[in-house]
């Protein structure tokens, strides 16, 4: 019963905060809030220029590989466990997945963002 009450309270509170955050900015619409800000000076150009989608994909790929490298960091400590064959198999699978992912990105020209 206490868990259900806590879940209901958290759900209602978070819903209320989301609704307030959604409706509050619509009350004060000023032109200054919609304009870009460059250190107090007038903008030199348009700040609403689109960026390259290829660059975005390279950045996402970098983040994914960085996260997978973080999975490899505990391997030296994991090698001291009793289940060494299981650890080596999992490490080999993870490294194989990284190599296959890199090869796929390379063949699909996903690492080239200049056009």
UniProtKB/Swiss-Prot annotation:
Keywords: Electron transport, Membrane, Mitochondrion, Mitochondrion inner membrane, NAD, Respiratory chain, Translocase, Transmembrane, Transmembrane helix, Transport, Ubiquinone
Enzyme Commission number(s): 7.1.1.2
Entry GO MF terms: NADH dehydrogenase (ubiquinone) activity
UniProt-annotated location(s): Mitochondrion inner membrane
Broad class of the protein's primary localization: mitochondrion
Keyword Transmembrane part of the UniProt annotation: yes
Catalysed transformations (reactions): a ubiquinone + NADH + 5 H(+)(in) = a ubiquinol + NAD(+) + 4 H(+)(out)
Membrane-related topology note: Multi-pass membrane protein
GO CC, one annotated term: respiratory chain complex I
Keyword check for Transcription: no
Example of a GO biological process term: mitochondrial electron transport, NADH to ubiquinone
Transmembrane parts of this sequence: 3-23, 55-75, 84-104
Subunit record text: Core subunit of respiratory chain NADH dehydrogenase (Complex I) which is composed of 45 different subunits. Interacts with TMEM186. Interacts with TMEM242.
PANTHER family per record: NADH-UBIQUINONE OXIDOREDUCTASE CHAIN 3 (PTHR11058:SF9)
Role, per record: Core subunit of the mitochondrial membrane respiratory chain NADH dehydrogenase (Complex I) which catalyzes electron transfer from NADH through the respiratory chain, using ubiquinone as an electron acceptor. Essential for the catalytic activity of complex I.
Protein name: NADH-ubiquinone oxidoreductase chain 3
